[in-house]
Curated annotation (Swiss-Prot):
The lineage of its organism: Bacteria, Pseudomonadati, Pseudomonadota, Gammaproteobacteria, Lysobacterales. The gene is ribH. GO terms for biological process: riboflavin biosynthetic process. 5-amino-6-(D-ribitylamino)uracil binds at W23, A57, W58, E59, C81, V82, I83, N114. GO terms for cellular component: cytosol; riboflavin synthase complex. PANTHER family: 6,7-DIMETHYL-8-RIBITYLLUMAZINE SYNTHASE (PTHR21058:SF0), 6,7-DIMETHYL-8-RIBITYLLUMAZINE SYNTHASE DMRL SYNTHASE LUMAZINE SYNTHASE (PTHR21058). Catalyzes the formation of 6,7-dimethyl-8-ribityllumazine by condensation of 5-amino-6-(D-ribitylamino)uracil with 3,4-dihydroxy-2-butanone 4-phosphate. This is the penultimate step in the biosynthesis of riboflavin. Belongs to the DMRL synthase family. Pfam families: DMRL_synthase. It comes from Stenotrophomonas maltophilia (strain K279a). (2S)-2-hydroxy-3-oxobutyl phosphate binds at D86, T87, R128. Pathway: Cofactor biosynthesis; riboflavin biosynthesis; riboflavin from 2-hydroxy-3-oxobutyl phosphate and 5-amino-6-(D-ribitylamino)uracil: step 1/2. It comes from the Bacteria. This is 6,7-dimethyl-8-ribityllumazine synthase. The keyword Transferase applies.
Length: 155
């Protein structure tokens, strides 16, 4: 019986893309900083990290698909923040973004990590962007490293 489990060891030559929405920039900038710090702390050179900004979470799947099709990145980290408002717009954006990112991952076989915060209040986002619930950008980066390692092991 074989057992496979990824760890944080990734080839030094591996490239990572961080896609981040500009919407709610105060939150997303903190997520990006956490992701970059986490990748660098695990041996990924700054030159191997591409940061791409998009207007909002809605645009993340399209850019992720373009990057995945180019096959230049070992993983694509997506970061954003959607905060519930008074309309149903929140559900449309958060749900369709997640569905689109999953489709890109499955269609191209490249890990696409969903670090888009879908929260009720700005305080919930702050708690997940370096506050009491940690930094989800850091967590997404660690998951990306682990997935790259795991996929290298699988037959």
């Amino acid at each position: 019986m074989s057992h496979y489990e990824g760890d944080l060891r990734t080839p030094e030559s591996a490239r990572f893309a961080i896609l981040a929405s500009r919407w709610n920039a105060r939150i997303t900038d903190t997520l990006v900083a956490g992701a970059r710090q986490s990748l660098a702390g695990n041996g990924i050179a700054e030159a191997n990290i591409d940061v791409i900004r998009v207007p909002g979470a809605w645009e993340l799947p399209l850019v992720a698909a373009r990057l995945a099709a180019a096959h230049e990145h070992a993983a694509i980290l997506t970061l954003g923040c959607v905060i519930r408002g008074d309309t149903r717009h929140y559900e449309h954006v958060a749900d369709r973004c997640a569905e689109g990112l999953m489709r890109v991952q499955l269609d191209f076989g490249v890990p696409v990590l969903n670090g888009v915060l879908a929260v009720e209040r700005v305080e919930d986002a702050e708690a997940r962007a370096g506050g009491s619930h940690g930094n989800k950008g850091e967590e997404v980066a660690l998951a990306a490293l682990e997935m790259v390692n795991l996929l290298e092991q699988l037959p």
